[in-house]
């Protein structure tokens, strides 16, 4: 018994030393806790003093406005509600649109999400927001650059459709006579956005030339063709300078992986692409354990759970999933391209030296630890697999133009 503390008599010298170290560390922690308590008490006193001196209504208003912006960035609807309830924003489409258009301290992804909602107020705000853009005497690419920089386009097809429809109506109103209908403007706008992706996405190897871009847009002007000079100017503008897309979180991918649809350890088989004739035997396919994260219609895999950057990214766009039997591993499934004619899956991976290269898979074969986990992964991936909404909406709008033309024919 030492200083009122019981000490077993049969301790070895090493155990006594370890016990003494624990007691000493405990005492240090108690001292540290007391110091933190005193610092916290001082800080609270300072805060209370500051609040007591904040008699300025302007200062209080600014604090509430900053709080409202933060709330908007986390939940746009609740943020607007907070600002309206605190009389910082009038509950009219015009005032809300002006607040979003100025965008001070606002997350552009949150702006896009709010504008894309289908509720009556949101739709009115969308049209008021678009009306704040001045597109007069701008060509279509210039107008799109301005429009797409003011918010981040959401991923849902229905939201994109409403926003691009509003853009087309505004552009045609500002530039009467350029296109015969808003449908033409709508279709060409999507064609330009797709061209931007094709020309500047490193994963797209087949870069469309001017002739293909012109051919792609034949007959979209109420059944007629647009002037080739107009299409050439749009093509050159995109080729020379890609769209600048707002990135609220910079290049840090960490934010992407918050609240994923699913995550866990899986085994991934090496590249499935056939070897070139010049390389007999090809590379040996091996199974590698990777940490997979499913989010935002993409499958990311990491070497370790603590890695900030993924080793590979597999966009699920236009892919399908199926169960497969493998003699070497149980609980397998595959990602593949339906009706595949030899093309590789659009994906990328990071080599050991840091280089980012295109994936070399015609299929991705993956093994889960258990049957139950395999079923859950398949279910989650099936829910995330998407068909590019641009192609779906373009096809629907082109069909509408074609039907309209046939109806007008005698």
From Swiss-Prot:
Is Phosphoprotein among the key words of this record?
A: no
Q: Is Membrane there in the keyword field?
A: yes
**One Pfam assignment:** PH
- Gene Ontology BP terms: regulation of ARF protein signal transduction
* UniProt: a 1,2-diacyl-sn-glycero-3-phospho-(1D-myo-inositol-3,4,5-trisphosphate) binding residues: 268-271, 290, 301, 311, 349, 360-361
PH domain mapped to chain residues: 259-386
Q: Which domain of life is it from?
A: Eukaryota
Provide the coiled-coil residue spans. Answer: 13-56
Q: Name one GO cellular component term.
A: cytoplasm
Query: What keywords would UniProt list here?
Result: Cell membrane, Cell projection, Coiled coil, Cytoplasm, Guanine-nucleotide releasing factor, Lipid-binding, Membrane
Annotated SEC7 domain residues: 54-241
Region annotation C-terminal autoinhibitory region: where it falls in the sequence? 397-405
Topology in membrane: Peripheral membrane protein
UniProt xrefs under InterPro entries: PH-like_dom_sf, PH_domain, Sec7_C_sf, Sec7_dom, Sec7_dom_sf
> Which GO terms fall under molecular function for this chain's record?
guanyl-nucleotide exchange factor activity; inositol 1,4,5 trisphosphate binding; lipid binding
* Locations listed in the record: Cell membrane; Cytoplasm; Cell projection; Cell projection, Growth cone
Q: Which PANTHER family match?
A: CYTOHESIN-2, GUANYL-NUCLEOTIDE EXCHANGE FACTOR
How does this polypeptide assemble, per the annotation?
A: Heteromer. Composed of TAMALIN, CYTH2 and at least one GRM1. Interacts with ARRB1. Interacts with ARL4D; the interaction is direct. Directly interacts with CCDC120 through the coiled coil domain; this interaction stabilizes CCDC120, possibly by preventing its ubiquitination, and is required for neurite growth in neuroblastoma cells. Interacts (via N-terminal domain) with INAVA (via N-terminal domain).
Q: What does this protein do?
A: Acts as a guanine-nucleotide exchange factor (GEF). Promotes guanine-nucleotide exchange on ARF1, ARF3 and ARF6. Promotes the activation of ARF factors through replacement of GDP with GTP. The cell membrane form, in association with ARL4 proteins, recruits ARF6 to the plasma membrane. Involved in neurite growth.
| Description of its domains | Binds via its PH domain to the inositol head group of phosphatidylinositol 3,4,5-trisphosphate. The PH domain is necessary and sufficient for plasma membrane relocalization. Autoinhibited by its C-terminal basic region.
Name of this chain's protein: Cytohesin-2
Organism from which the protein derives: Bos taurus (Bovine)
Recall the taxonomic lineage recorded for the source organism. Answer: Eukaryota, Metazoa, Chordata, Craniata, Vertebrata
């Amino acid at each position: 018994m030492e200083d009122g503390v019981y000490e077993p008599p049969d301790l070895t010298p090493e155990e006594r030393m370890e016990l003494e170290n624990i007691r000493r560390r405990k005492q240090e922690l108690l001292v540290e806790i007391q110091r933190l308590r005193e610092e916290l008490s001082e800080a609270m006193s300072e805060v209370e003093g500051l609040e007591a001196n904040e008699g300025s209504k302007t200062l209080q208003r600014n604090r509430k406005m900053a709080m409202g912006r933060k709330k908007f960035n986390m939940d746009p609807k609740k943020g607007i509600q907070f600002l309206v309830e605190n009389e910082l924003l009038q509950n009219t489409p015009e005032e809300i649109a002006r607040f979003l258009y100025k965008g001070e301290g606002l997350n552009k992804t949150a702006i896009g999400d709010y504008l894309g909602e289908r509720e009556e107020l949101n739709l009115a705000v969308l049209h008021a927001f678009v009306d704040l853009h001045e597109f007069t005497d701008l060509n279509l690419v210039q107008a799109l650059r301005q429009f797409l920089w003011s918010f981040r386009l959401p991923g849902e097809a229905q939201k994109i459709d409403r926003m691009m429809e509003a853009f087309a109506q505004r552009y045609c109103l500002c530039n009467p006579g350029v296109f015969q209908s808003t449908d033409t403007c709508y279709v060409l706008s999507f064609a330009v956005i797709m061209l931007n992706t094709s020309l500047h996405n490193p994963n797209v190897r087949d870069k469309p030339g001017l002739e293909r871009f012109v051919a792609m847009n034949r007959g979209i002007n109420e059944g007629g063709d647009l002037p080739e000079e107009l299409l050439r100017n749009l093509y050159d503008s995109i080729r020379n300078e890609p769209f600048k897309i707002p990135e609220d979180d910079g290049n840090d991918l960490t934010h992407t992986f918050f609240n994923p649809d699913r995550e866990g350890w899986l085994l991934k088989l090496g590249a499935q692409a056939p070897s070139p004739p010049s390389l007999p035997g090809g590379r040996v396919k091996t199974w590698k354990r990777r940490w997979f994260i499913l989010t935002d219609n993409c499958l990311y895999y990491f070497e370790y759970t603590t890695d900030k950057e993924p080793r590979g990214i597999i966009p699920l766009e236009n892919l399908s999933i199926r169960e497969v039997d493998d003699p070497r591993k149980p609980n397998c499934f595959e990602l593949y391209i339906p009706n595949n004619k030899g093309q590789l899956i659009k994906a990328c991976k990071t080599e050991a030296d840091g280089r980012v290269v295109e994936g070399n898979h015609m299929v991705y074969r993956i093994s889960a630890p258990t049957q139950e986990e395999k079923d859950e992964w398949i279910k989650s991936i099936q829910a995330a697999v998407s068909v590019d909404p641009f192609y779906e909406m373009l096809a629907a709008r082109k069909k509408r133009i074609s039907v309209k033309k046939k109806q007008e024919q005698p």
